[in-house]
Design a protein with these regions (language model features):
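RNA/tRNA-interacting regions in translation and RNA-turnover enzymes
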Residues: 1-171
């Protein structure tokens, strides 16, 4: 916004990530001290809040321990649909990728089927570990999860969506 800084009229200013209303947890690439440099795709003149992806709405619910079915985005959506007498449309899950059978690579024994009635595994090859997309990092940070890398972040993202804990492991270490 237009203003005066030390008596000089200015159309904008340089700010740290904290001065822009965020923090280094959401933007780990931001310098610890100093000016935050926006990504190349930032639109000149656009609100910093919008450019940083902070214009999203975050709703916090206080879920009691007897409602574990609501410990996920899908669970909250199902409950909201029931509360407001609306239709619930669960996400459509499709299986893509290779047709390899995980049992050909690893053996899993469920020791207590009452506690774990179903166990699923998939083989994913040719993964390059690196940073997650910015949109995913921001969504994880908005629910209090620190982004780590694409592999860890995708399991955390799915956990938040479905309430199911996932684990990614190197096949040779299982």
């Amino acid at each position: 916004k237009k203003g005066k800084l030390r008596g000089v009229e200015s159309d904008g200013m340089m700010c740290s990530i904290e001065e822009l209303g965020s923090n280094r947890e959401m933007y780990p690439e931001a310098p610890e001290y100093g000016i935050y440099i926006f990504d190349d795709d930032a639109v000149v003149g656009e609100s910093a809040i919008k450019s940083l992806g902070l214009d999203d709405v975050v709703v916090e619910y206080e879920i009691t321990s007897n409602r574990v079915d609501c410990f996920s985005v899908v669970g909250i959506a199902r409950e909201a649909a029931a509360t407001f007498n609306k239709a619930f449309y669960p996400p459509v899950v499709t299986q893509t990728g290779n047709d390899e059978n995980a049992a050909d690579y690893i053996k899993v024994t469920v020791k207590n089927p009452e506690l774990c009635p179903r166990y699923c595994a998939r083989i994913v090859k040719n993964i390059k570990i690196g940073p997650s997309p910015k949109w995913m990092q921001r969504r994880l940070a908005s629910v209090g999860i620190r982004p780590i890398n694409n592999l860890v972040d995708i399991t955390n993202y799915v956990m938040e969506e479905y309430g199911q804990i996932g684990r990614a492991s190197c096949r040779e270490r299982v």
